[in-house]
């Protein structure tokens, strides 16, 4: 059975803040010099978690993937983010996957900040030439704060989240 874990008020508060607001970015998720922001988006959506046995045999919440709209500063959808594998797709059909280089915790209940090195794009369009994707200003999305044991095996939880996704190109 699927349930929705609501995170009250975060989307309203973030809607009033500027995209990719000035924040001190930890060094571990800083994009290397020689790359400049080519596109800024706000991802708004959900992350699917399942209660199941982990690789070490213990029960726990296992990340199953995101499903989010990527919106521009005016709130217009310009792409989507989904997986697995983690895929960022522009409305023009071009898309990228990538290799996670680093994550940095961003508070209880929030998925971590992230730095991803992009693989070459599929298709022509906005994702062509993207070198890195940086996830900042994360709100929500972390594994559910509820029991995951044999009694809850195979339970699926959907957790809402929002984050800024910055796409970089070599300049």
Regions found by a protein language model. Give the residues of each.
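Bacterial N-terminal signal peptides
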Residues: 8-17
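Bacterial N-terminal signal peptides that target proteins for export
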Residues: 1-8
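Primary mode marks residue(s) on the alpha4-beta5-alpha5 output face of response regulator receiver
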Residues: 23-46, 55-171
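Sec/Tat signal peptide C-region and signal peptidase I cleavage site
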Residues: 18-22
């Amino acid at each position: 059975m699927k349930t929705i874990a609501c995170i009250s008020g975060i989307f309203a508060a973030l809607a009033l803040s500027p995209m990719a607001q000035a924040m001190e970015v930890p060094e571990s998720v800083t994009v290397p010099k020689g790359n400049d922001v080519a596109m800024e988006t706000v991802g708004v959506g959900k992350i699917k978690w399942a209660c199941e046995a982990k690789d070490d045999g213990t029960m726990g919440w296992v990340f199953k993937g995101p499903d989010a709209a990527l919106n521009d500063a005016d709130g217009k959808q310009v792409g989507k983010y989904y997986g697995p594998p983690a895929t960022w797709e522009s409305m023009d059909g071009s898309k990228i996957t990538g290799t996670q280089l680093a994550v940095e915790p961003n508070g209880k209940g929030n998925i971590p900040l992230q730095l991803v090195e992009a693989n070459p794009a599929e298709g022509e369009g906005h994702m062509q030439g993207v070198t890195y994707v940086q996830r900042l200003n994360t709100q929500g999305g972390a594994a559910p704060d509820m029991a995951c044991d044999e009694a809850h095996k195979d339970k699926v939880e959907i957790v809402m989240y929002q984050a800024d996704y910055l796409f970089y190109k070599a300049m």
